[in-house]
Structures are given as structure tokens and as C-alpha cells.
A protein has these predicted regions:
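Extreme N-terminal starter segment of soluble prokaryotic enzymes
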Residues: 25-28
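Short beta-strand scaffold positions
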Residues: 30-32, 78
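Short N-terminal leader segment in a subset of presequences, especially plant chloroplast
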Residues: 10, 32-33
């Protein structure tokens, strides 16, 4: 079973959860809200650190994250709105190599996107996703 570390942005430290050491997890996904990270965690089938910014992040905290996440594959999965675009711009400045994962604008929010759509965009970004995610919610 995969382990997703669900962390608010101010708690990135070394510890062990479910047999996986967070320091050994290579992939990190930055999301805006708690409901976003819970939905993403439900789709993933591999260990991933999921960091929630609670919609905003200060430049000082962003610089700290840059040090803490050095050497990891960082991805930003933000809502398709102005706040999401602002977050992406901040991360592009400090993490120019970060990958950006986009949901269809029709859903506007990560939390509002159907599970199958979220699985599809994560799979396109080379994440291992639960196959059953493609079958759930197709009628949404």
C-alpha cells in the first residue's frame, strides 16, 4: 500500500510514517487546500509527500521550502483560478524546475475535479495511480 505524507507547509521534517521515511520520498506535490491533498492522496499508488499551502505561502517560507526540498522532484497542482496561478508564479520563481500539473479549467478546483480526471492528470505527470480511480465517478 502506498503512503502519502499529508503535511501543512510549515511541517516538513524528517520522520517515519507507515514504514516509509519521508526523507527518502523523492516526489513532492504542492497543493492549496486540505481537501485537495486528501483527494490527491486517495488517487496515488506510490509514496509522495503532499504539502498544503492553505492557499498562500510567504516568500520567506518558500525560500525555506527550497532548502528543505532540495534534490526532490517537486510538482505544483493548484486550482484553475487566480489564487492558483499566483501560487504557480511563486513556485516558478523559486523552483524553476518544478513540474506543473493542471486540471481542466471546467472543474476550477482540484477538490471539485472528478477522481478519474485527477488520476488521469497525475498519470500524465508520471505518478503511479490506483487503477480503480479511473473507474470511480465516471458519471460525475
Amino acid at each position: 500500500m502506498a503512503v502519502a505524507f499529508l503535511l501543512p507547509y510549515n511541517i516538513v521534517s524528517s520522520f517515519t510514517l507507515g514504514g516509509s521515511d519521508m526523507r527518502q520520498v523523492e516526489k513532492v506535490i504542492i497543493v492549496e487546500g486540505r481537501s485537495d491533498k486528501e483527494k490527491v492522496a486517495a488517487v496515488l499508488n506510490e509514496p509522495v509527500v503532499i504539502i498544503c499551502t492553505n492557499g498562500t505561502i510567504s516568500d520567506a517560507r518558500l525560500e525555506e521550502l527550497a532548502d528543505e526540498l532540495e534534490g526532490r522532484d517537486v510538482y505544483v497542482l493548484a486550482d484553475a483560478d487566480e489564487a492558483g496561478e499566483k501560487l504557480r508564479r511563486q513556485f516558478r520563481r523559486v523552483f524553476p524546475e518544478a513540474g506543473h500539473i493542471y486540471i481542466d479549467r471546467a472543474y476550477r478546483e482540484v477538490a471539485a475535479a472528478p477522481i478519474w480526471h485527477l488520476a488521469h492528470v497525475l498519470l500524465r505527470a508520471h505518478f503511479d495511480v490506483r487503477i480503480e480511480s479511473f473507474m470511480r465517478g465516471r458519471g460525475e
